[in-house]
Amino acid sequence: MYPRRAAARWIEGYVLLEFTVTKTGAVRDPKVLEAKPPGIFDRAALNASLKFKYKPKVVNGEPIEVSGVRNRITFELTDA
């Protein structure tokens, strides 16, 4: 969800996150690596990442956890 304050001021930006993808494909321990502008979209990006679902990596027929996964979330406004 776009932060209300940022939307009202037409602020756009991005957040680069790093997290672990669990054996079930869920996101665990997301953290902000980089954000522009800093502090504006961090919470929204962290909350969104916890809803992500990945297909877990499989090794020898078994799902495994993968740490250090990165995802950049971009926040852009459009004229609707």
Predicted segments, located by residue:
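Conserved "boundary/linchpin" sites in short secondary-structure elements
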Residues: 22-34, 43-56, 66-80
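Short, basic/aromatic recognition patches
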Residues: 1-8
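Loop/turn elements at beta-strand to alpha-helix junctions within RNA-recognition modules
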Residues: 8, 38-39
